[in-house]
Amino acid sequence: LVDRHCKPLSLSEKYKENPDAMFVLWKDHTAEHEAAEINNADRLSGKGYSRHSGGHYSAECFWAKVLRVLRHSPELQNEASTAIELCDWIPAVLTGVDDITKMRVGLCAAGAKRMWAEEWGGYPPEEFFNGIDGKLVPILRNMPDKVYGCDKEAGRITAEWADKLGLSRDVLIGIGNIDSHSGAVGAGITLGTMAMNLGTSACFMAITRKNPHVI
């Protein structure tokens, strides 16, 4: 959860000791109940908003985690402008973005974690989220609706960060991307091949001309 200046609430004095104000680790499964609610709402809608993530919305994904946090620590709702992925926040920090409306977010996490898709015009509509829990609507409204591929730039590194990291001030920062997806690209994945990313989890990535609706 971040304020309108893209600052995580956990970096404020008021919430620095509140775990719900911090980034939530991907493998946290405390939002199983919320994920089940989202899956039920998706089935009832008949729209298939989770079709590009295997037809099932996981507790490891964005909306389930956000809803669980807002229910567990409702006081954060008044302070939060929206919620963002870590892979989107870091490029914003490095490029000096301090306005949520000017932040460039990546297509990768939006599609895999937040049910964004061109075919329904971006994110699912407000009515879908309101039917699950109205707490999600302000988060949706304040979220940047334009997304960018990882081949695009987020901006130029700030002088402060360039000097701190010992980099040229001409360095361009790329759009954020999910690590396992980036690993597949780095491994040289091509049509008809599979890349296995092994770490704290195992992600098997493949490219096919077919559209099985599985990530």
Residue ranges and their predicted role:
Residues 28:
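Carbohydrate-associated surface elements
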Residues 10-11, 34-35, 93-94, 101-102, ...:
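Short helix/loop capping segments that flank catalytic or ligand/cofactor-binding pockets
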Residues 171, 176-215:
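Catalytic phosphate/nucleotide-handling subdomain of diverse soluble enzymes
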Residues 2-15, 188-191, 209-210:
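Glycine-rich loop at the start of a catalytic domain that most often binds anionic cofactors/ligands
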Residues 20-22, 78-81, 142-144, 168-171, ...:
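Short coil/turn connectors at secondary-structure junctions
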Residues 13-16, 20-25:
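Short, acidic/small-residue loops that bind anionic groups at enzyme active sites
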Residues 4-11, 39, 46-177:
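Gly/Ser/Thr-rich active-site cleft segment
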Residues 1, 150-152, 198-200:
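Glycine-rich beta-strand-to-loop/alpha-helix junction loops that act as flexible
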